[in-house]
A protein has these predicted regions:
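Alpha-amylase-like alpha-glycosidases and glucanotransferases acting on alpha-linked glucans and related
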Residues: 210-352, 356, 373-614, 620-622, ...
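Residue-level marker for buried hydrophobic side chains located in beta-strands
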Residues: 364-366, 440-441
Length: 675
């Protein structure tokens, strides 16, 4: 790789080397670097192109007086300007409430070029918020967004406990084959009555309403809006006010429940038919108010849903004039599909109403899960295509478990376009997921710092890291979480740079402490008293074995049957048995597991004994379910995201049975000791 290409890559945040999972340096291929730069609209395909791009880098800041956006955290900031030397200059900050504050500091000249000067001026003390800087230079006014954010988020003052749930798996006797928002309300109400302070739920992001639905909550169509699959139709005001005959007709659409699988497609099809019966009774005023509140973002999503019903997915296969939200055919489409778009706005209103108020009187409340990205053919990718690197996907480099790397198939944010947009798209995302939330868990929180970009047509190992302005993204999170009164949790498992955890901790973002991963350098389990306090503690996650599954080696058996081990069954069994023996020995040494005691209870006792601010248990662990919700590396070979919660024998349980299970009551009594 030439020094010039390396210089260009560094300037755009594209890595030319990185440390792998074993902490060994890896050189990125020039082809991967060139591809990543191309995804940022930087031509680096030739020596001449690289030189031209370097010149452009040097000239670009001098073309406009103000930067695209200014972010200030934890105190007064400084503003950089590029103006004509000697020109009259007036600076003001326009506050988000309309007030104005003059910037009357003395500018300091840092550089000069071709009759222009690079100035830096100190900003006055400003209130937190989304403001605007206005610069009037020689009578011409330009502006840029200004974000003033707190330096640190507030973390829970008292330790608290709760449950982490896969909602779709918790089916009640009243739900239509899939755990729904009424079931979530039941979980929250039960947990609150027991003294719990938090409930973490899997991502509730919206799917594209075209069958078959993608069962993975981590590959959504939209992270800005929420899934209608979770609606309890009988809990809508439209149903409550309907005549008995219509209510009977709606209830008669309930599909039979498959005892062994969570089948979203028949459930959603039935709910859609039921909602269409109720649509003529929708509350016109409430819908108009909801549409006014959420504006263009909701209208674009609703239109996308209507168009997808007609043209299918992905949107890249739609008629060309409809492939952009500002395309030449969109105005006519809004007229032609106005009724159906209004219907999809109403569906989001119903979802919003059923999630409102959940957990608001708990110490933390309902914690939503934010997926790392969206389906390239879905609603957000269509509406936000200008700030996404379409054609590139997010994944992970090779490691000891995935020697070919991983490609998650999700297009990443473009860091340059986010900055140019003043981080407004990210603000909208954060505000959306914080609506009716006491907290947010950010999946793969390392993505605030960098993401592994895989070029189109390349293998997952043939990518490179692209960096983001983590301080700016954390500033957005900090301000919006402060305003929502919410806690932020980062999923920081696996290989994580030391600076990432330090930065997150300094910002008040809680980490994740998972029992399986809390080990020292030689792999020995750490006693819970040694875990970091600023974390959410759990035994496992959706991608890992359950407590009972780990003890029974169920994950080994399943991966062996599916040819997912990568080495011999005996080797894996020996490794897992060593891990289990070490874990049980640690629990015994800490006085958490007596001879003949229940190791699953002891694992939960370890969570209680830790200093972690939030401690969460899983209903699957409490009832003895052997099966993990998702088996990474599989698609159709394993029923990912389609398993109802079951007991140790594999018999599916209803939500009512789960809450009455003796194991749930025993673990609840243990967790109530969290202080």
């Amino acid at each position: 790789m030439t020094p010039a290409l390396a210089q260009l890559a560094a300037a755009h945040g594209v890595a030319t080397t990185y440390q792998d999972w074993a902490d060994s340096p890896v050189r990125v291929s020039p082809a991967a670097v060139v591809a990543a730069l191309a995804a940022l609209d930087v031509d680096a395909a030739s020596t001449e192109a690289v030189q031209a791009a370097l010149v452009e880098l040097e000239l670009a800041p001098w073309r406009t007086p103000l930067p695209p956006v200014l972010v200030v955290r934890g105190g007064p900031g400084r503003l950089d300007l590029h103006v004509e030397q000697g020109a009259a200059l007036v600076l003001e900050v326009v506050l988000e409430d309309g007030g104005r504050i003059p910037v009357d500091g003395v500018p300091v000249a840092l550089d000069r070029r071709d009759g222009q000067v690079h100035l830096q001026v100190a900003l006055p003390d400003l209130p937190l918020g989304w403001h605007t800087v206005e610069a009037t230079v020689a009578g011409t006014t330009t502006s840029c967004p200004l974000l003033v954010a707190p330096e640190r988020l507030a973390v829970p003052e008292q330790r608290t406990w709760g449950w982490q749930v896969q909602l779709y798996a918790l089916r009640s006797e009243q739900s239509w084959g899939v755990g729904d928002y009424a079931d979530l309300r039941t979980v929250v109400t039960s947990a609150r009555a027991d003294g719990a302070g938090a409930v973490l739920v899997n991502p509730l992001h919206a799917e594209t309403p075209v069958l078959p639905l993608n069962p993975s909550p981590y590959s959504p169509s939209s992270r800005l809006w929420r899934s209608p699959v979770g609606l309890r139709v009988e809990d809508t005001l439209e149903y409550a006010g309907a005549p008995a005959e219509l209510q009977q007709q709606v209830s008669g659409l309930r599909p039979p429940t498959d005892p062994d699988r969570v089948l979203r497609d028949p459930s959603f099809a039935a709910k859609l038919a039921a909602l269409e019966l109720l649509w003529p009774r929708h509350r016109v005023g409430a819908l108009a108010q909801f549409r006014h509140l959420h504006g263009g973002g909701l209208e674009d999503f609703a239109l996308f849903c209507a168009l997808a019903e007609v043209h299918g997915t992905p949107w890249q296969d739609w008629p060309e004039q409809l492939r952009r939200p500002d395309g030449p055919g969109i105005a006519a489409a809004r007229v032609a599909h106005a009724e159906r778009a209004a219907f999809w706005c109403w569906v989001q209103l119903l979802v919003d109403e059923q999630l409102a108020g959940l957990g608001e009187d708990m110490a933390v409340g309902l914690v939503h899960d934010l997926a790392v990205g969206v389906d390239a053919g879905g609603a957000d990718a269509w509406a936000l295509q200008d700030v996404l690197a379409l054609g590139t996907t997010v994944g992970a480099p090779p490691d000891s478990f995935n020697q070919q790397g991983q490609d998650w198939g999700l297009p990443p944010w473009r860091p340059d376009r986010l900055r140019a947009a003043g981080y407004a798209p990210y603000r909208a995302l954060v505000r959306g997921v914080l609506r009716h939330a006491g907290g947010v868990r950010i999946d793969h929180v390392m993505g605030l710092f960098r993401l592994w970009w895989v070029p189109e047509g390349a293998g997952a190992a043939e990518g490179t890291y692209v960096s983001y302005d983590a301080q700016a993204l954390l500033a957005v999170l900090a301000l919006e979480a402060l305003r929502a009164g919410a806690v932020i949790v980062g999923e920081d498992l696996g290989t994580v740079e030391a600076r990432v955890r330090t930065t997150l901790d300094d910002a008040g973002v809680l980490g994740s402490a998972v029992l399986w991963f809390e080990t020292d350098d030689d792999g020995s389990p750490l006693p819970p008293r040694s875990w970091r306090p600023a974390a959410l503690a759990s035994i496992t996650t959706h991608d890992l074995p359950t407590a009972a599954g780990f003890l029974a080696e169920e994950h080994v058996r399943v991966r062996h049957e599916l040819d997912q081990l990568g080495h011999s069954l005996q080797t894996e069994q020996e490794r897992v048995r060593t891990e289990r023996e070490r874990l049980l020995a640690m629990l015994g040494a800490e006085g958490l597991l007596s001879e003949g005691g229940d190791p699953v209870l002891a694992m939960h006792a370890a969570l209680v004994a830790s200093p972690c601010r939030i401690v969460l248990a899983s209903y699957a662990d409490a009832v003895g379910d052997l099966r993990q919700p998702n088996l990474p590396g599989t698609v159709e070979q394993y029923p990912n995201w389609r398993l109802p919660v079951a007991d140790a024998s594999g018999t599916p349980l209803t939500l009512e049975q789960v809450l009455a299970c003796p194991g749930v009551r025993r673990i609840t009594a243990l967790l109530q000791q969290v202080r």
